[in-house]
Amino acid sequence: VGFFEAENVKTVVDFAQKESHQNIILYGNSMGASAIMRAVAKEIVNPSSIIIECPFGTMQQTVENRFKNMNVPIFPMANLLTFWGGTINNFWAFNHNPEDYAKSIKQPILMMYGKKDLNVTNQETQQIFKNLISENKVLKTFPEAGHENYLNRFGEEWKENISLFLNDLK
């Protein structure tokens, strides 16, 4: 879910720095995006820029979205799963909120989102983007994409978005 995985992000950055790489750009999709956002917000990494795809807004909301997708009653089940999932994994899941982590992200950031994503709502995406404090933030939307790998399905458009973002960093 991206909570403890923030430490994995630190491990990767530490390795890259040890190998003398200085211009570190982090890329993450879904849970990976949330892990990057947490790692940056908790100041355990400081990349030069960030590229993220379809991060969820809050742990509670992402659980609710999945219950809705399965036509399972959201209340009280989503609350119980958020509570119990966090408890058995030794963290308070109600505080795992990438939309809050966004308030600490000052690096240039490209955020991509699929308009047909059933797991992450447009409202969550807009809130995250609004909360980003970066002066160089870009939101690209794929109108026909769901919660998926955009490169696989929209390769040329994805590559163009990445290239434009990276070229603007120079």
Each language-model region and where it sits:
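Alpha/beta-hydrolase fold nucleophile elbow
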Residues: 19-30
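Glycine-rich nucleophile elbow surrounding the catalytic serine of serine-hydrolase chemistry
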Residues: 28-38
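Hydrolase active-site cap/lid region
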Residues: 38-92
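Short beta-strand/loop motif that positions the catalytic acidic residue
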Residues: 105-106, 111-113, 117
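Short alpha-helix in the alpha/beta-hydrolase fold that links the catalytic acid
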Residues: 107, 121-130
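Acidic catalytic loop of the alpha/beta-hydrolase fold
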Residues: 116-120, 148-149
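Catalytic histidine-centered segment of alpha/beta-hydrolase-like enzymes
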Residues: 145-156
